């Protein structure tokens, strides 16, 4: 990962201007700086001095070191800088030459008011897809949904009222290569994030390498105990006491990417299979929407195979 190209994928300890439901976007002159490097004295001072000399006022500053000595330092700074949009490219260059080169920092600047371009991929289950579209229409998510891609046509009528293009690309085990080529034509260079909202196809390593942006997936937290078909039936037969969900970044290793968010709900012997499915869908919606929001707010930094969420 080269300097200036940090793939920050980023938890909410401060307000950071989250838009209220239906409210305005973040102020235009609010910027975010994410960085990661080998820990050593002087990093915070150097970052703060650079921003001050650029005319920026730091609103909040969160940092974490993985160890007292020899650890990795991670930081997220929120700052106000008049005329940020015109200055952000210069900030990126100057920070690289004056601070990042000295400390070996991987970093990225972002404008809070510039929403992430997001594509959602789905199959036939609608709960996660429609929840994201609904929350986004209410102004709860800092993103612009540019398209929905599905390998089945079932959800087209549900997506149209949101004014988002629905693209049906059939994908089976036999047609996966052709389907992924078409998906890449639509996605590569056009989106900042892809959300797999219960997209029930395994993406190839070649697709993940070529896509050029992070992907977030959601799955129930029975994995790996109840993989495959009918997990809720088998979970009830086993007498599970907790139902949960995990949102994570997608890697070549299935369902083992860096975890962004997890949650659980307690269940008991009175819950039927249908009850478990309903509870599971509720927690999946909540977990996925939080993970997507945190990513779009530049709160997540990936460190090895885990995340630091500020």
Swiss-Prot record:
Q: Name one GO biological process term.
A: one-carbon metabolic process
For bias type Pro residues, the affected ranges are 15-28
Q: Which GO terms describe its molecular function?
A: formyltetrahydrofolate deformylase activity
Task: Output the NCBIfam families linked to this UniProt entry.
Answer: PRK06027.1 (NF004684), PurU (TIGR00655)
Q: Which UniProt keywords apply?
A: Hydrolase, One-carbon metabolism, Purine biosynthesis
Coiled-coil stretches, from where to where?
none
**Which residues of this protein are catalytic?**
255
Quickly give the catalysed reaction.
(6R)-10-formyltetrahydrofolate + H2O = (6S)-5,6,7,8-tetrahydrofolate + formate + H(+)
What would be the name of the gene that encodes this protein? purU
Q: What is this protein called?
A: Formyltetrahydrofolate deformylase
Q: Which organism is it from?
A: Mycobacterium bovis (strain ATCC BAA-935 / AF2122/97)
Give every ACT domain span. Answer: 32-108
Entry keyword Hydrolase: yes
Indicate whether Hydrolase appears among the record's keywords.
Answer: yes
Protein family membership = Belongs to the PurU family.
Question: EC number(s) for this protein?
Answer: 3.5.1.10
Enzyme class label: hydrolase
Q: Where is this region: Disordered?
A: 1-30
What is the recorded function of this protein according to its Swiss-Prot or TrEMBL entry? Catalyzes the hydrolysis of 10-formyltetrahydrofolate (formyl-FH4) to formate and tetrahydrofolate (FH4).
For this protein, the record's PROSITE patterns field holds:
ACT
Any Pfam family the entry gives = Formyl_trans_N
Q: In which pathway does it act?
A: Purine metabolism; IMP biosynthesis via de novo pathway; formate from 10-formyl-5,6,7,8-tetrahydrofolate: step 1/1
């Amino acid at each position: 990962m080269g300097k200036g190209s940090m793939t920050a994928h980023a938890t909410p300890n401060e307000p950071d201007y989250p838009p209220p439901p239906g409210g305005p976007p973040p102020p235009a002159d609010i910027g975010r700086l994410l960085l990661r490097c080998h820990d050593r004295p002087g990093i915070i001072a150097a970052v703060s001095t650079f921003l001050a000399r650029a005319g920026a006022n730091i609103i909040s500053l969160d940092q974490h070191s993985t160890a007292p000595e020899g650890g990795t330092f991670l930081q997220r700074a929120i700052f106000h800088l008049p005329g940020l949009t015109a200055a952000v490219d210069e900030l990126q260059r100057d920070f690289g030459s004056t601070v990042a080169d000295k400390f070996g920092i991987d970093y990225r600047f972002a404008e809070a008011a510039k929403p992430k371009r997001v594509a959602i991929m789905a199959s036939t289950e609608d709960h996660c897809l429609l929840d994201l579209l609904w929350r986004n229409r209410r102004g709860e998510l800092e993103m612009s949904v540019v398209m929905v891609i599905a390998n089945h046509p079932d959800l087209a009528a549900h997506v149209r009222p949101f004014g988002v293009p629905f693209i049906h690309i059939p994908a089976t085990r036999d047609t996966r290569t052709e389907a992924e080529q078409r998906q890449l034509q639509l996605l590569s260079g056009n989106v900042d994030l892809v959300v797999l909202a219960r997209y029930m196809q395994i993406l190839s390593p070649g697709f993940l390498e070529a896509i050029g942006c992070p992907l977030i997936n959601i799955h129930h937290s029975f994995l790996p105990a109840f993989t495959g078909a009918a997990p809720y039936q088998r979970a009830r037969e086993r007498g599970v006491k907790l139902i949960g969900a995990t949102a994570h970044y997608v890697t070549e290793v299935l369902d083992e990417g860096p975890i962004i968010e997890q949650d659980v709900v307690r269940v008991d012997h009175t819950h039927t299979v249908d009850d478990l499915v309903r509870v599971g869908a509720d927690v999946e919606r909540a977990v996925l929407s939080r993970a997507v929001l945190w990513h779009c707010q530049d709160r997540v930094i990936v460190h090895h195979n885990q995340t630091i969420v500020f």
